């Protein structure tokens, strides 16, 4: 009698699980995997994963990692790792189509040296020193998404993040003790062109 009850409970649990999986697969697209082409053009492999919360909100996480040059003694470095958490509100009531706006929280760890660029006032110290540190920021953005069919889409967006960075400055490309520590606040622009696949 006890084993029969256990078998019945197991069958009910399996049926409920199958029904749940079938229900999720029958609903509209729930997830999107994407790639930011602007970030890729900067030679930073990246990937995003986004999920539908309801008919007008999605929640996502994006990450990028630029490990090269892998040689710690290389003179020029532009290595970084980033994570961006974001939420998007879709104004037409259907995720991944039409106008949207959103909010994000950003974290970046970087290791830079011998760079001749000044990205909106940032990284000026990296021209003659190696700097290593973190950026933390929050911001907002807006954009438009096009449905290309067969689950594929493309969206463009622009916005800004208010970011705080703390970094250590070194005299050589691979040294021990820092010569200075600095904190800065920046307003960073955010531009992306994302290609995504929804499922």
Language-model features: where?
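Gram-negative (and chloroplast) outer-membrane scaffold detector with strong preference
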Residues: 51-156, 192-197
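Residue-level preference for beta-strand/loop junctions
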Residues: 13, 29, 41, 79, ...
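Bacterial N-terminal signal peptides that target proteins for export
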Residues: 2-14
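Predominantly the C-terminal beta-signal and adjacent terminal strand-loop region
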Residues: 149-199
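Sec/Tat signal peptide C-region and signal peptidase I cleavage site
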Residues: 22-28
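Transmembrane beta-strand segments that form the barrel wall of outer-membrane beta-barrel proteins
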Residues: 29-42, 58-69
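Short, surface-exposed coil-to-beta transition loops
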Residues: 43-46, 139
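Cleavable N-terminal signal peptides
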Residues: 15-16, 26
């Amino acid at each position: 009698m006890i084993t029969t009850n256990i078998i019945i409970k197991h069958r009910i649990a399996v049926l409920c699980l199958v029904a749940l999986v079938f229900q999720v697969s029958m609903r509209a697209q729930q997830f999107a995997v994407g790639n930011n082409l602007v970030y890729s053009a900067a030679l930073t492999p990246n990937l995003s994963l986004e999920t539908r919360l309801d008919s007008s909100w999605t929640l996502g996480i994006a990450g990028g990692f630029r490990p090269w040059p892998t040689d710690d003694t290389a003179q020029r470095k532009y290595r970084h790792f980033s994570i961006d958490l974001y939420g998007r509100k879709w104004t037409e009531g259907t995720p991944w189509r039409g106008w949207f706006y959103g909010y994000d929280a950003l974290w970046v760890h970087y290791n830079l040296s011998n760079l001749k660029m000044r990205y909106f006032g940032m990284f000026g110290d990296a021209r003659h020193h190696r700097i290593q540190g973190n950026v933390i920021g929050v911001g907002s953005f807006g954009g438009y998404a096009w449905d290309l069919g067969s689950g594929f889409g493309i969206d463009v967006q622009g916005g800004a993040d208010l970011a705080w960075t703390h970094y250590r400055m070194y005299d050589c490309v691979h040294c021990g003790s820092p010569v200075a520590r600095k904190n800065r606040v920046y307003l960073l622009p955010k531009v992306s062109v994302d290609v995504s696949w929804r499922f």
